[in-house]
Amino acid sequence: MIVLVDGHKHHYEMECLTMMFFPGEKITTTTDLSQQDGDYLYTRLREGEGIGQLFVRASVGGTSAEEGMEIPLDAPDYDRQCERGFGRMVYRLLSAATGRAPKWGILTGIRPIKLFHQCVADGMTEEEIRQLFTQEMLLSPGKLDLAIQTQKNEQKVLSRSTRDSFSLYISIPFC
């Protein structure tokens, strides 16, 4: 599978997300747009006239599908919105093409609970968090419930921390 990146810097996120749909396969990321043979994922960002235009085409097994969306250039967190917009489109297209639906949605390369803690710190309600993570991040209901419960349990522990406390994160691969 080739991931073609055109006009944006989200190559790492696109590659990681693509790997979830093609486990064990070699994923090559390139800006060489001539490599649209065989299976590929083409992602493009064009900016102009106050709008960022995102476009994704997935060609898998001889069948192609595409999606696009627009984001105002002055949108809050424009870069993050582009990253997540690309992620949602890639997820939907590759899910339809492969029949896979990764339960953690578009979340790659980050501990999900870290995002949940940030949402709580920003004053979001549990309902707002649920909406964000199901609609924007495409988490499955089971993983969403697990993450919310984990965040609540972790917050109980963190609330007892003192100034001289520290956190130790141990990465345990589970792929």
Walk through the language-model features, giving the residues of each:
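Conserved, mostly hydrophobic/aromatic
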Residues: 175
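A short, structured N-terminal alpha-helical element that caps or precedes a catalytic domain
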Residues: 1-96, 100-103
